[in-house]
Design a protein with these regions (language model features):
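C-terminal motif of bacterial Sec signal peptides marking the signal peptidase cleavage site
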Residues: 12-15
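Edge beta-strand at a domain terminus
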Residues: 88, 124-144
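Beta-turn initiation residues at beta-strand->coil junctions
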Residues: 37, 73, 104-105, 126-128
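Positively charged n-region of N-terminal signal peptides that target proteins for export
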Residues: 1-4, 18
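N-terminal glycine/threonine-rich, aromatic-flanked beta-hairpin/loop signature
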Residues: 45-93
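An anionic, turn-rich surface loop/hairpin at beta-sheet edges
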Residues: 81-116
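N-terminal helix-cap/turn-to-beta initiation motif at the start of protein domains
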Residues: 17-33
Length: 144
């Protein structure tokens, strides 16, 4: 009986640790809002409403066929439009040790975040400080 229980525990752990696949990467396109931050201590902070959301846009680089893009902070408006400061943070998607990372490059330096989970309506990234950001797909305001 213990062996059966151990088998199901291992099966559960393996299924929960499904890695992000190359074909999942295009799901990153679009508007995303932070849903929860998990700090390295294990403490969490939930976000119910966000004044700003992140817009990700991906494309294939012409010179080396890598996935590149930018991230931009935008503020949703009640009319369905977005305000922005027009600052775009360039990035590329890189693969290391069977994991995908977003590598940002700005005039201030480079940083990277591991893509831990990427689905149609949710994704999680983790930075070098072991802080995880879980995003959910942004749903526009529906005021008419």
């Amino acid at each position: 009986m213990k062996k059966i229980g151990l088998f199901f525990l291992v099966l559960l752990l393996v299924s929960c640790n499904s890695k992000v696949k190359k074909e999942d990467i295009p799901k990153l396109n679009g508007y995303w809002e932070i849903n929860q931050v998990t700090f390295s201590t294990g403490d969490t902070k939930d976000y119910k409403i966000n004044e700003t959301i992140d817009y990700f846009e991906l494309r294939q680089a012409q010179f080396d066929n890598k996935v590149v893009g930018f991230k931009q902070k935008v503020m949703p408006q009640f009319d369905g439009k977005f305000k922005t400061n027009n600052i775009k943070e360039a990035f590329k998607i890189i693969k290391k040790d069977n994991s995908f990372f977003i590598e940002y490059t700005t005039k201030f330096g480079k940083r990277e975040e591991e893509i831990v989970e990427l689905q149609d309506s949710i994704f999680t990234i983790k930075n070098k400080d072991n802080v995880s950001y879980t995003y959910k797909k942004f749903k526009p305001f529906l005021f008419k």
